[in-house]
Regions:
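Active-site gating loops and adjacent loop-to-helix segments of metal-dependent hydrolytic enzymes
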Residues: 98-130, 206-207, 234, 252-270, ...
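Di-metal (Zn2+ and/or Mg2+/Mn2+) metal-binding site signature of metallo-dependent hydrolases
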Residues: 81-103, 245-246
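Alpha-helical scaffold segments that flank or form the walls of functional sites
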Residues: 53, 83, 100-152, 158-173, ...
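N-terminal metal-binding scaffold of metallo-dependent hydrolase/deaminase domains
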Residues: 1-70, 411
Length: 445
């Protein structure tokens, strides 16, 4: 779809008559005037009407609409459209992406997904296959307005070498367009042997993040201890899959948090999914949340994938949404984010690497609305902070002019339509928003 705006191909211009969510402005000390029409009881959207000056790829100035000296400078009327910073997608699985046509999940269950991916990876994940599918996902992300992506890479045995080599190639190829990070993905028992240390060395040499899946088992405590030992020894951050289940007895998140406290771990720790919190007693939830807060663990929720997989039983309507307790975690002071997770693979049959879809679907699934409040941070500034990325995910003077401009004039309009005509600005320049054609991958299917 064609962008609804045309930005002049010059280094200096104004975006006029835009609306920026208050929570996405970098300077929260300034008294920004809110649009009164959106401050009515029962319909509150904290939006600021602004003109934004772009110069040499950066935001040079922010002024209330109709003010400031704009003489002899090209100006683009945004027509009251929303202006966001670019998205930050901190949890993806690019190496699994887009295999659905050749390896569907027959019953849509979590176990069905595991088995389908196991078969596909052992038979098909050679270098060219992985490269092309990962690059396809990056093309989608970039066209939709994403600025940074973290991907988890299945890393058992030789697959780790293949996928991390591809990741390094793509990180170099996409430098200046997308900031890429990679976390390895194995079950935590993998770290108990010499192959686990070899993997940690591979991750460190790739400037990556140490990752894995925590499953409840009699050796879980020892496995987590080993992961922390390796992370400290190799100076690596952690990004772990925890409690991707609706079994109330799963408390791997708590194990991780308690280990972080014991180790006085100073690196970043993110835990993903944390679904079982949604079905546990208040007392169990309190114990885990207190430990997570004390440890400084951050949580990324994957609402679209969790809604798809969790509580799925043939012939039975699901009773649970499968999403973690985002409101309660945030209220307790835990930093939370949302992300896209899998895309067109056995773990999630749909998706398009679109940060806006992640936000709108998450708002519907997790009731992140009425009011929207600061939830837009969950797909912008919060994941940027959790990934250790500076000057990303907010709009402010001196920040990069990496923006998504929507025709929608309010959050209500934004979430009611798909916004396929959005305008993407990177380093001050409008980019081509054309999405890659699925036919590009036909010969791999």
């Amino acid at each position: 779809m064609t962008s609804f705006l045309q930005i002049p191909a010059v280094s200096h211009y104004w975006l006029c008559n835009g609306r920026v969510p208050l929570t996405l402005l970098a300077d929260q000390t300034r008294r920004w005037p809110l649009i009164e029409a959106f401050q009515q009881p029962g319909y509150r959207e904290d939006l600021v009407a602004l003109d934004i000056e772009v110069r040499d790829g950066k935001i040079a100035d922010l002024q209330p609409i109709g003010t400031g000296n704009k003489a002899d400078i090209p100006a683009v009327d945004v027509r009251s459209g929303l202006i966001w910073p670019c998205f930050v997608d901190m949890h993806t699985h690019l190496d699994k992406g887009h295999i659905w046509p050749r390896r569907a999940n027959a019953d849509g269950t979590f176990n069905g997904a595991l088995e389908a991916v196991r078969k596909d990876s052992t038979q098909r994940w050679q270098a060219e296959d992985v490269y092309r599918r990962m690059e396809f996902g990056l093309k989608c992300s970039y066209a939709h307005g994403t600025q940074a992506v973290r991907t988890h890479l299945d890393a058992n045995g030789a697959q780790g070498e293949i996928s991390f080599e591809i990741f390094r190639q793509l990180r170099k190829a996409w430098a200046g367009k997308l900031q890429l990070q990679a976390a390895c993905l194995v079950s935590l028992d993998y770290y108990m042997g010499p192959e686990g240390e070899n993997l940690a060395d591979l991750v460190a040499s790739s400037t990556g993040v140490l990752g894995g899946v925590a499953y409840m088992n009699p050796e879980l405590a020892q496995q987590i201890e080993r992961v922390f030992e390796l992370a400290k020894e190799k100076n690596l951050d952690l990004d772990l899959h925890t409690d991707e289940s609706l079994d109330p007895n799963e408390i791997t998140l708590r194990y991780v948090a308690e280990a972080a406290i014991r180790h006085q771990f100073t690196g970043r720790i993110t835990c993903a999914h944390c679904c079982s919190l949604s079905v546990q007693s208040d007392d169990e939830v309190r114990k885990t949340v207190e430990a997570v807060k004390a440890a400084g663990v951050t949580v990324v929720s994957l609402p679209m994938c969790n809604l798809y997989l969790q509580d799925r039983q043939p012939g039975r309507t699901p009773r649970h949404r499968g999403v973690t307790i985002l409101h309660e975690l945030k209220a307790a002071g835990v930093k939370v984010a949302i992300a896209s997770d899998n895309c067109r693979d056995p773990f999630f049959a749909y998706g398009d690497h679109d940060g806006l879809e992640v936000f709108t679907q998450s708002a519907r699934i997790g009731h992140l609305d009425h009011p929207i409040a600061d939830w837009p941070q969950a797909i912008t500034s919060a994941p940027a902070e959790m990934m250790g990325l500076e000057n990303m995910g907010q709009i402010g003077e001196g920040w990069g002019a990496d923006l998504v401009v929507f025709k929608a004039r309010s959050f209500n309009e934004l979430m009611a339509r798909g916004q396929g005509d959005r305008t993407i600005i990177r380093q001050g320049r409008q980019i081509d928003p054309t999405l890659p054609d699925y036919a590009e991958l036909d010969d791999l299917m």
